[in-house]
Regions:
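Nucleotide-activated donor-binding/catalytic signature segment of Leloir-type glycosyltransferases, i.e.
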Residues: 141-159
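Carbohydrate-associated surface elements
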Residues: 51, 72
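Conserved acidic donor-binding segment of nucleotide-sugar-dependent glycosyltransferases
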Residues: 213-222, 230-235
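Membrane-proximal helix-turn-helix segments that form the acceptor-binding/catalytic region
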Residues: 21-45
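Conserved donor-binding/catalytic core segment of Leloir-type glycosyltransferases
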Residues: 46, 89-116
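A charged, aromatic-enriched C-terminal amphipathic alpha-helix characteristic of glycosyltransferases
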Residues: 236-267
Length: 269
């Protein structure tokens, strides 16, 4: 299994810049032995997205011996919620957007604070919920204070189950500002609850999320904010993307469906 290529620290989109360059270099170098062992000695390789297939094709391993394992979502809580028909109207929801993920450079969380600052210039009372923990927690808190966004951004820490679902129910959009990703499963959770997404147009996300998410030119923070504002101010566009999001996750991301797909790829007739 090989689920994330370490970013080359000298690449433009590498999250390991400045004082973190050495850390990124060590990370990249440490992964090379595993990559070559898997590439030349494994009978079957699991990767997380379609762009990662090609690096493992060799003269002895064809494409059919490389399986994309995308991950999945338990869609049953959202399905039950929709069947009840008692959901919160968009205009009454507490959060304008939410983020779920590790507070790490790769996830674009520092960029997210600047993006939300731009959103607040147009909608001063807009609110963002951030779910997750990670090494950038302190830096994020300082940046929020520095930008005067204490009333606009709520850090909720780690949430799971009902607590996390309650945030989805109270949100209008899910944001995925990752600057480096091999697929990105976090937004799928919110999309299962009918939340349209906004992300950067990363290569891996093209096959993961062909619909349900507004893709933004990498790494244009103003354009990202504009996509958020577009969804918040256009009910018809929000509804269309919301339906696309929930349908995509229901049809392609449900765990039972994913398990069947993987089984048929690995245990071929």
């Amino acid at each position: 299994s090989f689920y994330l290529f370490a970013p080359k620290p000298w690449q433009k989109n590498s999250p390991y810049k400045g004082i973190n360059y050495l850390l990124g270099l060590v990370y990249w170098l440490s992964q090379l032995p595993a990559y070559y062992i898997i590439k030349y000695f494994a009978d079957l390789v699991f990767v997380t997205s379609q762009p990662d297939v090609k690096p493992f094709i060799t003269k002895n391993r064809k494409k059919n011996k490389i399986t994309v394992v995308r991950g999945g979502v338990d869609t049953s809580p959202a399905k039950k919620y929709f069947e009840q028909g008692d959901f919160i109207p968009i205009t009454n929801r507490h959060y304008d957007a939410c983020f779920v993920g590790r507070l790490h450079y790769q996830k674009g969380v520092l960029e997210l604070i600047h993006i939300w600052g731009t959103v607040c210039k147009k909608i001063p009372k807009s609110r963002l919920a951030i779910i997750g923990m990670g090494p950038l927690d302190g830096e994020i808190r300082s940046l929020i204070k520095q930008m005067g966004l204490q009333l606009n951004i709520t850090l909720l820490g780690f949430l799971n189950g009902i607590e996390k679902f309650d945030v989805f129910k109270q949100s209008k959009i899910i944001l995925h500002p990752a600057t480096y990703d091999s697929g990105g499963m976090a937004p799928a959770e919110g999309m299962a609850w009918g939340l349209p997404g906004v992300s950067f147009d990363l290569e891996a996300l093209k096959t993961y999320y062909p619909k349900g998410i507004l893709k933004t030119k990498c790494f244009d923070l103003d354009a990202f904010a504009s996509n958020i504002l577009y969804l918040l101010s256009n009910p018809d566009a929000h509804l269309t993307l919301s339906q696309e999001a929930s349908n995509l996750i229901r049809d392609y991301w449900d765990w039972d469906q994913q398990a069947q797909n993987i089984f048929h790829q690995v245990i071929k007739p």
